[in-house]
Design a protein with these regions (language model features):
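Class I SAM-dependent methyltransferase "Motif I" SAM/SAH-binding loop
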Residues: 55
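Catalytic nucleophile loop
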Residues: 60-61
Length: 187
């Protein structure tokens, strides 16, 4: 499975050589919500593995779960737990799962050990990651057997300096793409 449908979206380089490459659109898009439902269905069609949705308890990952449910796509849910360090967020994920009769897979990660062991730096290097908070997620997903799908905030769309609308893809979010490729993760 490609990391973007039909390699529509690809990147190259990092730091000073960071580039985003987009192919021309082949069809007119509809609403953001409808396109998300379509994306969920395309992921299901393309995936060779069980779909695993990473759920943080944030509104973006809750939206993702609701979209996959609406698309009638079979999925499992995984939650990364850092114990006391993300209890304030994870509680929403656990409450949602309980309310919707979902039994999540829980990935326990000792955040202090992850940092003090130097693994945080090793993964940052391997994934070309410039955002320390993403490395623990990268570590948490590496051993999940499935097609890993994550939500990552709303689309970053705004007006450019010349008044034209643009889509902004920060380099830091691309570290997941590097990590998926490095670790052989489908998603």
């Amino acid at each position: 499975m490609n990391l973007s449908y039909n390699d529509y979206y690809t990147t190259s380089g990092n730091q000073d050589t960071w580039e985003v490459h987009l192919k021309p659109c082949t069809q007119k898009s509809t609403t953001y919500h409808a396109e998300c439902v379509r994306a969920a269905q395309l992921i299901a069609e393309e995936s060779s593995k069980q779909i695993v949705l990473m759920f943080s308890g944030g509104i973006d990952s809750e939206f993702m779960l609701n979209v996959f449910k609406e698309a009638q796509v079979d999925f499992k849910v995984a939650i990364i737990s850092y114990g006391k360090w993300n209890k304030h967020d994870a509680i929403y994920a656990f409450d949602y799962c309980k309310l919707h009769d979902i039994v999540p897979d829980i990935i326990d990660l000792d955040l202090e050990q992850f940092v003090t062991s130097g693994l945080i730096y090793e993964i940052a290097e391997q994934g070309h990651c410039s955002a320390y908070q993403m490395t623990s997620v990268m570590h948490g997903i590496k051993d999940i057997d499935g097609c890993i799908v994550m939500a990552n905030c709303e689309p970053q769309i705004g007006k450019n300096y010349d008044g034209k609308w643009m889509w902004d893809e920060p380099e830091r979010t691309n570290c997941y793409r590097h990590w998926y490729q490095y670790a052989g993760i489908e998603g």
